[in-house]
Amino acid sequence: MASPDLLFNLRNLFYLGAYQAAINNSDVPGLDADAAAERDAIVFRSYVALGSYQLVISEIDSSAATSLQAVKLLALYLSGDKESAIVSLKEWLSDSAVGSNPVLRLIAGIIFMHEQDYTEALKHTHSGGTLDLHALNVQIFIKMHRSDYAEKQLKIMQQIDEDHTLTQLANAWLDIAVGGSKIREAYLIFQDFAEKYPMTGMVLNGKAVCCMHMGSFDEAETLLLEALNKDAKDPETLANLIVCNLHLGKPSSRYLSQLKLSHPDHVLVKRAVSAEDNFERALQAVA
């Protein structure tokens, strides 16, 4: 008989965006060395997701496991030390002793996806090996507008574990990317998460995006305001509220100002700044 998966609940909390809950519930007894290392990686990735980059950088020293060193590189990268993080990352990846570590490959994929260097990201993630890597492949292929390749990755995940939270999440992401009648299926996946697990900003945003695709902007706004109450600085919540309010004919400048302050590199901020610059140039040309 298979031994129980002691990290099942912890992983689910992390995957669904309940990062503080994952940290609070990380004291799991009876873990062997490998499971303890995975637990530590989840905890530090949760701190990264909450923006506590310096805590991660200071607490993971040079003697830590490869998986934790990888998470530290992600914290360095997101804290603004991008060039140094990428140089170190490439050194680690070229080291035959640790370069194949699945967490290191996952972090490489995440960092290069942030860089919008999807070819480089896939170089490290395409061979898969874990559900996390396959799920990241789905995200990368969606970013590349290759839903056909994303679907192949999803099918591999479904063969491994169709009911796994990551498989269901990847299914929802792909359904939203494909659109049309698939949006309803994505909505039902997020609804299922909402019924089974504590409601998180990620699940609320997922439901809200589906609602917007289906034209239910009032329901989407209600969900997004609930998400905003959970985290007033979450970039996806703010970005989705901007889009939702534009469709509802409501002012969205306050949310855009918040997004500019907390996440100046967000794609929506860059588009808004570019539009403002173009408008200024047009005014000057007329003047």
UniProtKB/Swiss-Prot annotation:
Topology in the lipid bilayer: Peripheral membrane protein
Major subcellular location class: cytoplasm
Record localization: Cytoplasm; Golgi apparatus membrane; Cytoplasmic vesicle, COPI-coated vesicle membrane
GO biological process entries: endoplasmic reticulum to Golgi vesicle-mediated transport; intra-Golgi vesicle-mediated transport; protein transport; retrograde vesicle-mediated transport, Golgi to endoplasmic reticulum
GO molecular function, one term: structural molecule activity
Coiled coil: none
Keywords: Cytoplasm, Cytoplasmic vesicle, ER-Golgi transport, Golgi apparatus, Membrane, Protein transport, Transport
Keyword Cytoplasm: yes
Domain of life from the UniProt record: Eukaryota
GO terms under cellular component: COPI vesicle coat; Golgi membrane
Keyword Cytoplasm carried by entry: yes
Function summary: The coatomer is a cytosolic protein complex that binds to dilysine motifs and reversibly associates with Golgi non-clathrin-coated vesicles, which further mediate biosynthetic protein transport from the ER, via the Golgi up to the trans Golgi network. The coatomer complex is required for budding from Golgi membranes, and is essential for the retrograde Golgi-to-ER transport of dilysine-tagged proteins.
Similarity comment text for this entry: Belongs to the COPE family.
PANTHER family: COATOMER SUBUNIT EPSILON
Known partners and oligomeric status: Oligomeric complex that consists of at least the alpha, beta, beta', gamma, delta, epsilon and zeta subunits.
Protein name: Coatomer subunit epsilon-1
Organism of provenance: Oryza sativa subsp. japonica (Rice)
